[in-house]
């Protein structure tokens, strides 16, 4: 790990981390906002701002260190050409331990809507005994599609947590949580985009104290161009976690809504994004599907394979409903556990995710933000309603997949 610690800081009570790759255009802005929040709300504590970088060739680190702040700064980076947000955060966790900090948070380097209040809302609950605080945002209705169609409904339906932004990227945590994360086995995809769902799912498993903060509007760089690899790494990490922790799927569960422990004040303004064309997304799904499906078609039951063949291979027009999507996800997760072709299963899921995304855009294009959010909530409820579709398959499976149903 590369480190530049100009003030030779050896200990801190609070660490605010900024994982980054090529964010020279925004790092000064976000560093200044963090500094303002620390000055306003935590001036009596030793705080340090840490940029955990991927050795960005655009000189993100140099811009960070040159940004004027009252609080000291430390720059750390992966070595050579090593990439991945997860690698950044692992380095950050190690630095938090090294500094002996009890309270920490991380914010994505592309955030444009951060305010000093974010710092207060994230850090104060940790000082009151919480161990992990996740965000709640108001976002453009087409932003956060992996959250809306995979991680949120699957956590809701299978684990029973109403965790609205499990891969938001901005979160706070205690030193206990940091120790817990470091002790876990990290799957390969957690070194990249899988890190956020790794952190959230492990936080659920930990039994530590969890909460949420309402941050108001979220403005950031659109991630549509990164969805391909991002989906693969998020899905692989989450499926890996669920497959290795079957004790977390009880037969009967009560839904748990995380307490809202702070709210940022201010007018809600939704980010304007470039027009999203469902036809382009649908074409991606249609192009990817045949090869992925060919390798797995014999493993799918007729109630899944029949509609897929009709939509993708015959009509070439997609209408993947929320109800059908929940069963597709559960079916492919089941196959992920019992078949060796795990990469092919995740790639098939990706093509179907793009199909679900296109279908949802067609369904929502005349709806306002509030109406679209209701559809996301309804989809999560369908995942909960249909959880027995997965549990029934797992219950029939003998040996290592037998669930603890009591």
Residue ranges with predicted function:
Residues 50, 61-87, 95-98:
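Conserved donor nucleotide-binding strand/loop of the catalytic core
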Residues 53-62, 111:
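A conserved acidic beta->alpha catalytic loop
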Residues 133-145:
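Short beta-strand-to-loop element that shapes/binds the nucleotide-sugar donor at the catalytic cleft/hinge
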Residues 18, 42-56, 78:
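Short beta-strand/loop segment that forms part of the nucleotide-sugar
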Residues 101-112:
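Short beta-strand-to-loop acidic/aromatic patch adjacent to the donor-nucleotide binding site
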Residues 236-406:
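Terminal low-complexity segments of carbohydrate-biosynthetic enzymes
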Residues 2-5, 23-40:
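Short, well-formed alpha-helical segments that are part of the catalytic scaffolds
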Residues 115-136:
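Conserved donor-nucleotide/metal-binding helix-loop-beta segment in metal-dependent transferases, i.e.
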């Amino acid at each position: 790990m590369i480190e530049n610690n100009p003030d030779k800081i050896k200990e801190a009570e609070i660490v605010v981390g900024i994982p980054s790759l090529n964010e020279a255009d925004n790092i000064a802005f976000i560093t200044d906002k963090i500094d303002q929040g620390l000055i306003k709300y935590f001036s009596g504590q030793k705080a340090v701002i840490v940029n955990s970088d991927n050795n960005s060739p655009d000189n993100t680190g140099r811009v960070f260190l040159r940004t004027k702040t009252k609080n000291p700064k430390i720059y750390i980076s992966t070595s050579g050409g090593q990439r991945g947000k997860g690698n950044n955060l692992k380095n950050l966790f190690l630095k938090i331990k090294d500094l002996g900090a009890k309270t920490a948070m991380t914010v994505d380097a592309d955030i444009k809507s951060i305010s000093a209040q974010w710092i207060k809302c994230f850090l104060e609950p940790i000082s009151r005994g919480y161990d992990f605080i996740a965000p709640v945002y108001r976002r453009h209705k087409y932003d956060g599609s992996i959250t809306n169609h995979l991680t949120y409904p699957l956590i809701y339906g299978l684990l029973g947590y109403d965790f609205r932004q499990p891969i938001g990227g901005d979160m706070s945590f205690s030193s206990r949580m940091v120790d817990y994360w470091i002790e876990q086995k990290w799957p390969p995809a957690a070194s990249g985009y899988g890190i956020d769902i790794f952190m959230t799912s492990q936080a659920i498993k930990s039994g530590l104290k969890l909460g949420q903060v309402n941050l108001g509007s979220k403005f950031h760089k659109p991630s549509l161009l990164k969805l391909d690899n991002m989906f693969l790494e998020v899905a692989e990490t989450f499926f890996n976690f669920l497959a290795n922790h079957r004790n977390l799927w009880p037969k009967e569960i009560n839904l748990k809504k995380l307490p809202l422990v702070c709210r940022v004040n201010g007018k809600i303004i939704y980010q304007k994004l470039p027009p999203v064309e469902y036809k382009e997304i649908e074409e991606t799904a249609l192009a990817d599907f045949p090869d992925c499906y060919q390798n797995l078609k014999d493993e799918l039951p007729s109630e899944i394979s029949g509609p897929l063949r009709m939509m993708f291979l015959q009509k070439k027009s997609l209408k993947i409903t929320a109800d059908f999507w929940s069963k597709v996800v559960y079916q492919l997760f089941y196959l992920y556990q019992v078949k060796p072709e795990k990469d092919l299963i995740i790639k098939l899921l990706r093509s179907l995710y793009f199909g679900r995304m296109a279908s949802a855009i067609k369904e929502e294009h005349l709806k306002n933000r509030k109406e679209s959010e209701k559809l996301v909530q309804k989809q999560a409820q369908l995942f909960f309603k249909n959880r027995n579709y997965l549990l029934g398959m797992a219950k029939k499976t003998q040996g290592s997949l037998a669930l603890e149903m009591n």
